[in-house]
Structure formats: C-alpha cells, structure tokens
UniProtKB/Swiss-Prot annotation:
It comes from Variola virus (isolate Human/India/Ind3/1967). GO terms for molecular function: structural molecule activity. InterPro entries: Poxvirus_P4A. Interacts with P39/A4. Keywords: Virion. This is Major core protein OPG136 precursor. It comes from the Viruses. The lineage of its organism: Viruses, Varidnaviria, Bamfordvirae, Nucleocytoviricota, Pokkesviricetes. Core protein 4a is the most abundant virion protein. Major component of the virion core that undergoes proteolytic processing during the immature virion (IV) to mature virion (MV) transition. Residues 616-698 form a propeptide.
Amino acid sequence: MMPIKSIVTLDQLEDSEYLFRIVSTVLPHLCLDYKVCDQLKTTFVHPFDVFLNNSLGSVTKQDELQAAISKLGINYLIDTTSRELKLFNVTLNAGNIDIINTPINISSETNPIINTHSFYDLPPFTQHLLNIRLTDTEYRARFIGGYIKPDGSDSMDVLAEKKYPDLNFDNTYLFNILYKDVINAPIKEFKAKIVNGVLSRQDFDNLIGVRQYITAQDQPRFDNTYAIADAARHYGVNLNTLPLPNVDLTTMPTYKHLIMYEQYFVDDYDRVPIYYNGNRVIFDDEIINFCISMRYQSLIPRLVEFFPDIPVNNNIVLHTRDPQNAAVNVTVGLPNMQFVDINRNNKFFINFFNLLAKEQRSTAIKVTKSMFWDGMDYEEYKSKNLQDMMFINSTCYVFGLYNHNNTTYCSILSDIISAEKTPIRVCLLPRVVGGKTVTDLISETLKSISSMTIREFPKKDKSSIMHIGLSETGFMRFFQLLRLMADKPHETAIKEVVMAYVGIKLGDKGSPYYIRKESYQDFIYLLFASMGFKVTTRRSIMGSNNISIISIRPRVTKQYIVTTLMKTSCSKNEAEKLITSAFDLLNFMVSVSDFRDYQSYRQYRNYCPRYFYAGSPEGEETIICDSEPISILDRIDTRGIFSAYTINEMMDTDIFSPENKAFKNNLSRFIESGDITGEDIFCAMPYNILDRIITNAGTCTVSIGDMLDNITTQSDCNMTNEITDMINASLKNTISKDNNMLVSQALDSVANHSKQKIGDLRQSSCKMALLFKNLATSIYTIERIFNAKVGDDVKASMLEKYKVFTDISMSLYKDLIAMENLKAMLYIIRRSGCRIDDAQITTDDLVKSYSLIRPKILSMINYYNEMSRGYFEHMKKNLNMTDGDSVSFDDE
C-alpha cells in the first residue's frame, strides 16, 4: 500500500499536468449543468504583481483590485515612514519595484501550524504574501495585502497583539510613487515629475516654496539637481525677482513648505534661521511641532484617536534668542488651539497628518466580501454538498482562519484540521492557468459540452470534391506527369500542368476516378508543388483525431490562375478557354479549402504551430484542414497493458496514454499562449475523457413522477414551445440550463413516431373491422334472404364487442405513446446532465406522460376516433336494430 504522504495531490501540480488532472478526474463527476459561483470565477492577485504585469489583473475583480491599490498605497506610506513596522519587503521607485533582501519584521507570535506549501504557480508578490499569511499573523498579512473590511456583518474581526492605523479612502499614492518620468535626484522620497520634458508646475511651485528656506550656499546645488532654472524659464518665472522669504513664524503665510523641507530635504540641505516674533528659535523640533500644530489644527483630535498617548497641550514653549543673543523662553498659547509634540518622529507624523488631511477631503472605499480574505463561515462550508466540496478543493487553494492565544492565524484548511484546531472561516484562492481562473475554465468547458448537439459528437468533416474529372487511366497518366514537373518558374509550371491536363482530358473516357482518402494529401501536395506553389504540411493530434494542415501560398483563386496564365503570354481569351477546358481540375484546386473541420483556424494555428514562413504575406494562403479519427489500437497503450504483470500494475497503466499525452501537449500550448478558453479545452479533449463526462457527469437527480407532477397541462396547449416551457419550468428546481432545443427535438421525435404508429393502428383496425363487417353481412343475409329475425341483444353484443376492440386498441396506442414520451423525457434529463432517482415507473406516470404529449397528437387521436365511429355507425345502420338508441359509440 502506498504511504499517504507519497500520494500526489492536486495542489502539488501545476500548469498542464494540473489542468489535465482536473479535466480527466474532476470534470467527469460534475453535473453538466453545474453552475460555478460567480465569486469563484475571479481570484486575488497582489497589486504589485499587477503593476509589473497588467495581464495578471484580468483574473481579478476590478473594483476589488482598485480598492486594494488604494489601501496598499496608504499602508505602504505608513510602513516606510514608521520606525517600528517595516513589514514590506519592497522599495517602490520610479517605474520599478525593488525587493529588499533583508528580513522583514516578522512578529514573535508565529503561526503554530507549520506551512509546507510553496505556491510556485503564483506571481512572486502574491506568493510572498501567502507565505507571510501562513507564517505570521493574519492581521499583518492583511496589512501587507491591502485588505479593506467590507460592508455588512459577514466578516471576521481578527485578533492581533498590536494593530496599526487603519485609514481607508480613495487615492493614487501608488501610481504617483511608481510614476516613471521623474528627476533622478539623491532624495528618492520626493518625486519631482517630468511632464512633456519639463518639471510639472505643481512640483515646481513646491520646490520654489522649499527653496526659500534653503541657505544661499546650498541653493545652487538644489537648483542644479531639480533643473529649477529650466523650469523657471518654461513657466516665465524670474528667480532673481522672487520676494524675500518670510522666516518669522508669527507672520508666515503658510507653513506648508517649511514642513515639506523637514519631511524631505532636512538631511541634504541646510535651512536658514527661523524666528518667532523677531527672536531666533533655537531647537528644530519646536519649530516643526509649532508648524504642524498650526497647519493641522483640525486634525489633532483625529490623530489622538490612533495615538492616544501622544502629548497634546494647550500651549508650547519655544526656546529663542533675542537679537542680543540672550536666551528667551516664549510660551505660546492661543484660544482654542492645541499643540502636539511628535516626539522627534517627524517624517512619520508629517506623513500621517497628510494622510488624515487626504482622508478628510476624500470618500471612503466600499467593497464587498472577498473570498480570499473574508471567505465563508466554516459551518456554511461544511453544509455544502459533496459536489461543491470536490469542485472547490480541486480548483482553489483552501485556507482556514483560527484563533490561538488571542491571535488569529491562517493556514491550509487540511493542516488546521490535522492539527485538531477549530476553523472559524474558510477562505478560497481560485487557481490560475493560462491567464484564466480554473473555475472559469471549468465553467466554460461544461457550457461547451452541455451545448453540444448530437450532430457535433463526433463532429464530422464536410464533404469535399474527391476527383478531377479524369478516369482511372487518365488520372494515373496525369499523376505520372506531375512527378516529372520540377524546378520550373511558377507561372510556367501552372500553364504546363493545366495544358497537360487538357491534353489528357480530350481523349479520356470513363467515369471520374475518386481519389482514395489515404492518397488525398499526397496528391494535394504533389499537384500544387508541381505548379510552383509553396506547400507546407503540419500535423498534430487534436482530441482523438489526427489533424493535418496543408498551407498553400499564394492563395489559390480563379482570378489568380487567370492572372498567372496571362503572365505566360496568354491572352485573356486564351486563359479563359484553358480554364474552361480544365474546369474539373481548377474546380478541385479552388474548392479544396472550402470545407472546414470542427476547429476554427485560430485553434489550428495553436495546435500546429509554424516556425518558418515563405511566399505571400500572412493570410494570403489557401488552408486545407483534414481530420482523421485515430484508430482504437493507436489510442490505447497496448505496450503498457501487456507489460503489466500484476493487477496493481495494470490498474496504474494509463490505457489511453497516447491521446492523453497529446491532450497534455495541447494544454501546454494553450497555457503558453495565455489565451486559453473552455472551448479550446473541450475541442482538444480526447474521446476517452469526453465519453466519461457524457456518461457519468451529473450528480443531481430528477424524479420522473415529480417532474410530471410539476407540469401543468393546458386545454389549449397544442404547440411545441408551450410544452417546452412547461418541461423547462419543471426542471428549474434542479438544473438551470435552457433546454428549449433539446425538448423540442425530443417531443418532435415523439410526435413523428406517433404519426407512424397511428398508421399501424389504422391498418390493424381496418383488418378487425372487416371481420365485424363480415359478421354484420351474415346477419343482414339471414334477415333479408331467409327472413329469420336476429334479436337486438345479439346485434348490441356485437357492437359492444367492436367498441371494446376500439377501446383496447386506443389504450394500447396510448401506452405506446406514453412510453415513447417517457423515453424522450429520460433523454432530456440525461442530456441535461442529471440522473433518475425513481425506483420504478408506475401506471400513474404513464397517464401523466400521455397527458403531456396528448395536445401534440390530438388531431391523430380525433382522426382515429372518427374513423372508428364511422365503422360503428355503418354497421349499426346495416344491422337495422329495432331499438337503435340502445347502444351508441362514445369516445373520450
């Protein structure tokens, strides 16, 4: 027996191998009409991954992604300016995201359940986030992932040792930070954006505002770094005529630029002295505390909500020196004013005040519940049926949230259960293959299979012309001539082949020789190659068919042939005569590409990639697509079967290994193209998998009796679409697919069969009526010729027996039609992907079945009744009964 830990599970597989397992093992156990939850058709991708690769955002909810980008911008600014957080392992620069190799600040309260999953199929930042989520606390993972709590109560407040400021408003911080075209300055925190080759006006105004507080010695370096002179000329600003800076705190028009200096430039450029009422302020911390308190006065109460321990006073003491350099301590106190002490943590609190100011003038972000973060309640997850459980666990990474020591952690759900912990919520991350979520691919595949009609399975080629108008002798002569044509100019080769054909055709007699299918491709290649066309052949396996694609360049058309012949000194009339004489050949050449197999040209391109091009431009070519079913012996791994010595070895053998291997290769090509669809998977699916899906799919059950009970008959219901609506309505409780075409086909089949059987019933009735007619003739003869009287009771008995015969015949006919209708109903249910759960079909079901189909065959029933009534009345008249009203013919 294989150890349990050595079993390969779906979450350990990736790409084509994973998708193959899903299609071959999970898909056959799903109802063909299985409806995938819309919330599972999208997944979560970290915004950093989307910034690096826009295509990754196609599998996410756009509103959820935009909300995460806004939230992540806030969290990143909080993290990078904080002295203690440092949770992000990246640095955002202009146009790129650099990964920091130093360890991030992981909490001491690590997850007690060890994570053993790597998630290599995920993008790098999403993979890193999952590793953090399964290692550290859930709260920190949500901070790094840009989580926003949704509206409503169906979410979980996670427990954490320490929580960080939670701000939520719409913003473009990440876009501004990652803006590519900026001035390459030593100070990376301030992004001086270049717009149309010049410093943006907003940044120019801010830099001019900061420049006034920089010393004269450092201003040239500052101007050179940010190209201030060029921007000033562009905006028509004369730097020499700028007003002198106001450096007194009591008269400054705004504290914005002094705060910006402290936030970005304090470490690189010296600042001019700052005064308060004419006295120079000694300590820089007091200057920034005063400026922040004055500029963000209205936001101080909001700040205290997040940091209740921060010192807030009604006044501030400024240590200053007067013009004589004497120390003067000034206590500043203003009515209804508070002063905050940011404890020398200037950059963080300046940044945080800016965030609060932005929050005040912005709208909050509203999001819905996220299956990745919020998930569902564990009890709700356990209440799902087995089919949903199997689908979710096969197509998604399944996580669980649980509490341990007053802290919320996230782990793989199976690991939580193995560790005997109690999950609170279950979170899902749908997997992505080839640029689409697996859940969405399965939904599309089921839809493609479910909408397939009988004519499409197996799909057949359209017929094509298989002769060139020559007899077998003439064809063989022409074939030998083609083999001798070589190394001639294209125009000359076409003319010589056409003229050779015309010469053979003139003396040819006999019926056309039909080209054998096994020789068709060889003849096509030889014919067009001998005419100088560029012919390439590509072969592949698609589904359970060998696919051949012959490309002929340039494209073969009547006009092209005429033009080519005219280039070889033929007049237009001569060319037309040649074409008329060689009509069958040219008709064959032009029509070879008129038919298409069941795959589209785009899909053929994917299955049969081309690596070398020649001839006319792309698209100007004739494409011949040929499909041949693979023989059953070629589909089966006979070597593997016969090399197995034990039952276990035989069970482990993939019987349909050849076509399954081709299926995997096709899946790999689709995944590499990044444009895979459910229709592609369906068309590439081999018959051994498709047969299992058609046969086994559908775990939902339908009761014939219940369904017939739900169908309400109508007296005027004599149209197919009305019956269709009733059947669809009765099936809606179990399946959701629209079966209009399926029901119409089935009921029309019953109606046609009923018409055939009414003919049989009429013939048998006529034969039996002849017997009664002979009996009536005998009675007539006895009474008329022999003058013997036959009693009315004898005559009435004979007529009653005829009525019994017609009733029995009609009853048998009704039972036959009821059974045919039940067969149609079973066909509808089976084709809808469901199975029957009735133990047996009762006589009541037959009555209900007949009542359903009766409106469609009412005219035939009336015809039979009128025919039987006519026979009855004719016999009754000939019998000349004394009491004619003693017996009558009553139909239903």
